[in-house]
Amino acid sequence: MLAQDQDIIASNLAAVEEHFHSEAANDIERALELYTDDIVWEAPARNLVFRGKKDVADNYRKLFASIREVEFRNLQRFATEDRVVDDSIVTFELTRDGFLPLQVGQKVEMRLAHIFEMRGGKISKEIAFEMWRPV
């Protein structure tokens, strides 16, 4: 592997790490900076697809207004020059209706697998596979 390829992979991993850190800190604006303008965000289990930074931003603000006490625990993460795959467990408490079919106040543990497509050190597509359960 060329040193340039290793640098690209390291940059991709750093961008995804910063993205998750920003989400956990509820710094949505910083998380959005790590997306390309033509970002596509998908959550297949909930049949959701958002295109473009504005629509993704609206979804993120709604989603993160619906949860609190967010904690990420990374299980594994690896990358290539154009992809990052992440497997994590995220825990949170629901604060409003509309995100998951559970009652407000419910604590949730979610196994969250992501495939990120990367371009120029930013996320151009995020596919989030969500497997949740009340705890």
Residue ranges and their predicted role:
Residues 15, 25-42:
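Short, well-ordered alpha-helical segments enriched in acidic and aromatic residues
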Residues 12, 52:
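Hydrophobic (often cysteine-bearing) scaffold residues that line and stabilize catalytic clefts
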Residues 2-11, 21, 27, 42, ...:
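A beta-strand edge to alpha-helix "cap/lid" segment located at domain peripheries
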Residues 34, 40-51, 62-65:
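A short gly/proline-enriched turn/hairpin at secondary-structure junctions
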